[in-house]
Amino acid sequence: MTKTLAGPAVAALLAAVAMPVAAQTTTLRIQNHNAPESTTGRLIAEFVENVETMSGGDIDVEMFYSASVVKSAETFDAAASGILDCDMTNGSYQTGKNPAFQFVADTMGGYDTPVQFHAWVSHGGGHEMIDDLYNAQGMTLVGNHVGGQESLNSTRPLAGAADLQDFKFRSPPGMESEIFANLGASPIVMDFTEIFTALETGIIDGADASTLANNVGLGIYDIAKHTTYPGFHSMSADHLACRTDVWEAMPEAHRAILTAAEKALALDLMTLTEVENGEALVTKLPELGVTVYDWSTEDRAAFREAAQTAWNDWATRTPETEAIVQSHRDFLQRIGLSE
């Protein structure tokens, strides 16, 4: 005898089948070290909007600017330990863990343009090398972003290498401090967010902060009336890196959205920095009374020589540093920037 489902049972079954499955949501607490009004800060705000729009609201990003939760250099560990979920600062802050972290962000005297650095990341094995380094710390690399060569800023003339003698300036931790110390300067390592106050109070004569455009946004040229341009000494790439268990728990679609939004941020930062650097050079810096110094070929060569000496030294410190330095050298040769 064939039994049929009663009307209420059929209705209940059909309702269950038709009921949409609730979308998985992702909530991320991310810290960066940029001021909201800076070039990078404004583009990070667009990154947040893009992520939330592309996910239909299923990814909720709580973004903290200007290292408002922990100090800039502590962001990576804060994400790894669960205070935050992701880090949007700079890998070179972590050179104390392994000197190889210097070369995930700023080769100093290596690449000339952001495109060349991104080419190494995307097509020279860079992403995999960085990710391996981060995985050992419980973090996963999503992507990198960099605007362009940075400018040194000073409250005193900075026309060439000779002016570096006894020049007290803010430096990030890592290889840069050693290079400039060898050139006669007195680098002082301090948090990115402390630069303005240190300049204002005279603790430092100048700073290595960021690009012309970002420096304008940070208000540095309200105090420091001397700067170098075009930049030559540093092109430091920030990153988006998330705690590995958080990253792996996300739906694949959410990981794809974050990766795509980070790539869009990287492209926008390169192009907007080009525009805003030019605007700063032509209009804003003259209005602020800033003197711009284009270092001679000889002075730039002196810096590059000091940087390459530092590369050789740092490459001996750990196997990971040796490998990543060699990777950069191989890629520089591959794209015709070195012999």
Predicted regions and their residues:
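N-terminal secretory/targeting leader peptides
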Residues: V10, Q24-F117, G125-E339
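Absolute N-terminal positional cue centered near the fourth residue
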Residues: T4-L5, A22, T26
